[in-house]
Amino acid sequence: MGKSQSRRDLFKLGGLGAAAGVVSSIGAGGLSLLSPQQAYAQAAPTSLLRTVLDRKKLIVGTGSTNAPWHFEDEKGQLVGMDITMARILSQGLFDDPNKVEFVKQDPAARIPNITTGKVDIVIQFMTVTAQRAQLVAFTRPYYLEGVALLISVKGKHKNYKALQTAGKSVRVSVLQNVYADQIVHAALPQAQVMQLDTEANAIQAVDSGRADAAAIDLSTVRWLVKRNPNAYIDAGYSYYPQIYSAAVRHGDQDWLNWVNTAFTVAMFATEGELYDKGLEDYFGLKPPVRKPGFPPI
């Protein structure tokens, strides 16, 4: 029996109403709880929740080349925060984080693979937009991405305030796109903009000293600082928030509700071991303090 299952059983034994478990009936015999079989029967016959439980594995569409979200480690195993979120679902379904089949896909395949049923869910650093929500159903957010400024330990500017003070003398590298100037100037209005063809080259410009800072994803900044604290610094300013969520097929409320519940429990309640480890491993962040009372969600 897994640690999370033991915790669930402990709460059940408490017999304290809704906080102790899901009450199925109150009669002469007192409180009774839904068995796994009864809980299973509550899902609609056509729900993917039933299909996944019957199949005994979860099929997840994701990528394999974008740290810290989804990438292969030195052993060739998929790791990253997206992979962690998938394992959280597997843990909730089967009390085993490893009953997952990962389908590696390009970002362009995320929506088609959901709508055609090739995968049960896509967890692949997917930005939520109103347009995409017409095609797939988004889960509750699990990350708020943004733009941040990466600077070198060897650079002359050590934080965001120093970059601001330097004014026109600051050079900022950024991935080439139509909004590049706008992205940089939103944080540093007077900075010189150096557009480069890849994010890797934008980072390399900081390494070589050609740029004082790189305007890149906040998650990438955190990942690089976590891995190379002697090389990089987070300047301490982030902006342009974008929501990351998982995506499922439209029309299956039971499946969507279950995924949302599993994510919420991992992020805010008693079963956060996997989520907390992901925060530390991939972002260098301390796990959130979970305090009883009104939820911060």
Indicate residue ranges for each PLM-predicted region.
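Short glycine-rich His-centered loop
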Residues: 57-81
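Extended ligand-binding regions for polar small-molecule ligands
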Residues: 43, 92, 154-155, 169-170, ...
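Short helix-initiation/N-cap motifs at beta->coil->alpha
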Residues: 100-112, 194-204, 242
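C-terminal segment of N-terminal export signals and the immediately downstream linker at the start
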Residues: 28-55
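A ligand-binding cleft/hinge motif common to bilobed small-molecule-binding domains
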Residues: 109, 125-135, 185-186, 207-241
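Acidic, polar ligand-binding/catalytic clefts
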Residues: 87, 91, 99-164
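N-terminal secretory signal peptides and thylakoid transit peptides that target proteins
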Residues: 1-21, 29
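Periplasmic-binding protein-like
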Residues: 64, 143-154, 218-263, 283-297
